[in-house]
A protein has these predicted regions:
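Proline/Glycine/Serine-rich low-complexity intrinsically disordered segments
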Residues: 1-138
């Protein structure tokens, strides 16, 4: 899943501006993208001021209320905000996309087989498309 910059719909901010100007950037505390952007900011001396939030929707709220200039989050909550009619837009991606998976001990071969079969059945069912549309805006 890509990580995106989100601004107000009428903002002129660009991804380059985010990395080169002294703006307020909102991130969700404790996420992999928060860890990555903090590390990158320190290494590359990005001038933005980070503001941390308990959730991506809270960052969107502060963005809309003018407390931050941009939010940085996974694409899913950004797409959800846009789908709900919030006055925000994605202005670009940054960083490495995040992949998700299920971890299983090597010795749990039977559990792995059950999980993989479950995924195959779910993705073959038309209900999978409904879930993607409902939760992933696809």
């Amino acid at each position: 899943m890509p990580t995106v910059f989100v601004t107000k719909k009428d903002s002129k901010l660009t991804p380059e501006d985010v990395l080169t100007k002294k703006i307020k950037l909102g991130i969700q505390r404790g996420t992999s993208e928060a860890v990555a952007i903090k590390k990158e900011q320190k290494a590359k001396k990005y001038p933005f001021e980070l503001r941390e939030y308990d959730s991506a929707p809270l960052a969107i709220e502060d963005l809309l209320n003018g407390r931050i200039d941009c939010a940085y989050m996974d694409e899913l909550p950004a797409d959800d905000s846009i789908a709900k009619g919030r006055a925000v837009k994605k202005i670009g991606t940054h960083g490495t996309p995040t992949d998700f998976g299920v971890a299983v001990r090597k010795s749990d071969t039977e559990l792995l087989k059950i999980i993989n079969e479950g995924y195959k059945k779910l993705m073959a069912d038309p209900y999978w498309k409904e879930l993607q549309k409902k939760y992933l805006n696809k």
